[in-house]
Amino acid sequence: MAIHLYKTSTPSTRKGAVDSQAKSNPRTKLIYGQHRCGKGRNARGIITARHRGGGHKRLYRKIDFRRNEKDISGRIVTIEYDPNRNAYICLIHYGDGEKRYILHPRGAIIGDTIVSGTEVPISMGNALPLTDMPLGTAIHNIEITLGKGGQLARAAGAVAKLIAKEGKSATLRLPSGEVRLISKNCSATVGQVGNVGANQKSLGRAGSKCWLGKRPVVRGVVMNPVDHPHGGGEGRAPIGRKKPTTPWGYPALGRRSRKRNKYSDIFILRRRK
C-alpha cells in the first residue's frame, strides 16, 4: 500500500498519513444499499456499543468469498477501495462473462489471471482445496464449513499457513497465533491479503475518524465515580484499583471473552496469543 503524506500546511494535515488508493465507481450490479440501523443502539434506542455513530453513507460491495467459478480463468480489471473493510477488493472478469469482486491478494496487479478449482496451479490469487496444497503454503480467505465461503484471514495483511495434513483434517496457523484443525476439503486462496500497511495510517484529525462512524472515547479516570469505577479523586488521581475495569466493574484487560465449552474447542490445538 502507498502511504500519502500531506504538506504541513495545517495542524490537521501535519501528522496525517493516509491511503493513496484512488477511489473508483463500483460496478452497479455488484453493490446494494444497506441500512446501518442503530449505530450502536438497540431497538429502544439505548446505547449497547459505545463510541459508535454517524459516519458517511456506504454502499455494500458483494464479495465472492466462495470462489465457486470452478476451472474458469478470470482477469483482474480494477483494484478498488472498499469502505466496508480495510482490505482492497478487485473486480474479476471471468471467461464465461461473469463479473465478481474478490479480496485483493498482495502483489496482484491489473491484468493478472486467477482461477479456482481442484488441481489448479499454486500461485497468488488462485483458490483450491487444502488437500491440493503443499505444506507451508501461505493462504487467506479460508473456509470453516465446506461451501459456506471463506471466513478466516480476510483482513488487510492477513495470512495463515498450512503446517500439517493428517487424515481428513489440515492444521493451520492463523494470524492470531491460534493453531486449529480444518477439513481438508475446505477451500482457501493462495497468498496474503493486500493493503499490508493498513495499520500504519494516521488519520491526523478527529473529523476523519468521525467519517468512519467512530465517536470520541473518554477515559474513565477523568469521569466522576458515578460514571466509571476509575473516576473521582482530587486532581489527577490513579484508578484506585489493582487492575483496570470496564464501566460496569468487570476486568478490562486480559479477560477471556470466548464462550466456555464452545462446540469448536475440540478443533483448536493451541489458543491464540
Swiss-Prot record:
<feature type="region of interest" description="Disordered">
    <location>
        <begin position="1"/>
        <end position="24"/>
    </location>
</feature>
<dbReference type="GO" id="GO:0016740">
    <property type="term" value="F:transferase activity"/>
</dbReference>
<dbReference type="InterPro" id="IPR012340">
    <property type="entry name" value="NA-bd_OB-fold"/>
</dbReference>
<dbReference type="InterPro" id="IPR022666">
    <property type="entry name" value="Ribosomal_uL2_RNA-bd_dom"/>
</dbReference>
<dbReference type="GO" id="GO:0032543">
    <property type="term" value="P:mitochondrial translation"/>
</dbReference>
<dbReference type="InterPro" id="IPR008991">
    <property type="entry name" value="Translation_prot_SH3-like_sf"/>
</dbReference>
<dbReference type="InterPro" id="IPR005880">
    <property type="entry name" value="Ribosomal_uL2_bac/org-type"/>
</dbReference>
<comment type="similarity">
    <text>Belongs to the universal ribosomal protein uL2 family.</text>
</comment>
<dbReference type="GO" id="GO:0019843">
    <property type="term" value="F:rRNA binding"/>
</dbReference>
<dbReference type="InterPro" id="IPR022669">
    <property type="entry name" value="Ribosomal_uL2_C"/>
</dbReference>
<dbReference type="GO" id="GO:0003735">
    <property type="term" value="F:structural constituent of ribosome"/>
</dbReference>
<comment type="subunit">
    <text>Part of the 50S ribosomal subunit.</text>
</comment>
<keyword id="KW-0687">Ribonucleoprotein</keyword>
<protein>
    <recommendedName>
        <fullName>Large ribosomal subunit protein uL2cz/uL2cy</fullName>
    </recommendedName>
</protein>
<keyword id="KW-0150">Chloroplast</keyword>
<feature type="region of interest" description="Disordered">
    <location>
        <begin position="224"/>
        <end position="254"/>
    </location>
</feature>
<keyword id="KW-0934">Plastid</keyword>
<dbReference type="InterPro" id="IPR002171">
    <property type="entry name" value="Ribosomal_uL2"/>
</dbReference>
<dbReference type="Pfam" id="PF03947">
    <property type="entry name" value="Ribosomal_L2_C"/>
</dbReference>
<keyword id="KW-0689">Ribosomal protein</keyword>
<dbReference type="InterPro" id="IPR022671">
    <property type="entry name" value="Ribosomal_uL2_CS"/>
</dbReference>
<dbReference type="InterPro" id="IPR014722">
    <property type="entry name" value="Rib_uL2_dom2"/>
</dbReference>
<dbReference type="GO" id="GO:0009507">
    <property type="term" value="C:chloroplast"/>
</dbReference>
<dbReference type="GO" id="GO:0005762">
    <property type="term" value="C:mitochondrial large ribosomal subunit"/>
</dbReference>
<dbReference type="InterPro" id="IPR014726">
    <property type="entry name" value="Ribosomal_uL2_dom3"/>
</dbReference>
<dbReference type="Pfam" id="PF00181">
    <property type="entry name" value="Ribosomal_L2"/>
</dbReference>
